[in-house]
């Protein structure tokens, strides 16, 4: 798999070997991103930059998820997802576009990615 910068992959997530994941993506615990090499698939899973994939969600083989989309927990994505779409259910359906409120709720992921936060945390605990 190809995994971008500042991407977070939570515990028990499965990333197929042919998957391509962009920068600043969050893959929730137990999520499955297909992308198996055997049997070979002509179209890999592509997760563009800034996507949030909830816990236990599944992105099927050959799907492209557009930048800054949100895939809800437990959703099963069988078809391509537009940029900034919010998808839920199994099979996944678009319910709306990503909003400013979504950005604020997801900002914790950006905070956790910053090296300064980790350094500050470790500095305090080392005293």
Each model region followed by its residue ranges:
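Internal active-site segments that recognize and position negatively charged phosphoryl groups
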Residues: 1-19
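Glycine-rich hexapeptide-repeat left-handed beta-helix
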Residues: 17-127
């Amino acid at each position: 798999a190809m995994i971008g910068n500042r991407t977070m992959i939570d515990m028990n997530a499965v990333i197929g070997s042919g998957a391509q994941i962009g920068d600043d993506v969050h893959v929730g615990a137990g999520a499955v991103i297909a992308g198996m090499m055997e049997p070979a698939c002509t179209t890999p899973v592509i997760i563009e930059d800034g996507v949030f994939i909830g816990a236990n969600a599944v992105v099927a083989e050959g799907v492209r998820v557009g930048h800054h989309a949100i895939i809800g927990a437990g959703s099963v994505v069988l078809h391509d997802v537009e940029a900034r779409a919010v998808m839920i259910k199994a099979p996944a359906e678009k319910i709306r576009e990503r909003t400013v409120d979504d950005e604020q709720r997801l900002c914790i992921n950006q905070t956790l990615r910053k090296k300064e936060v980790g350094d500050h945390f470790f500095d305090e605990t080392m005293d």
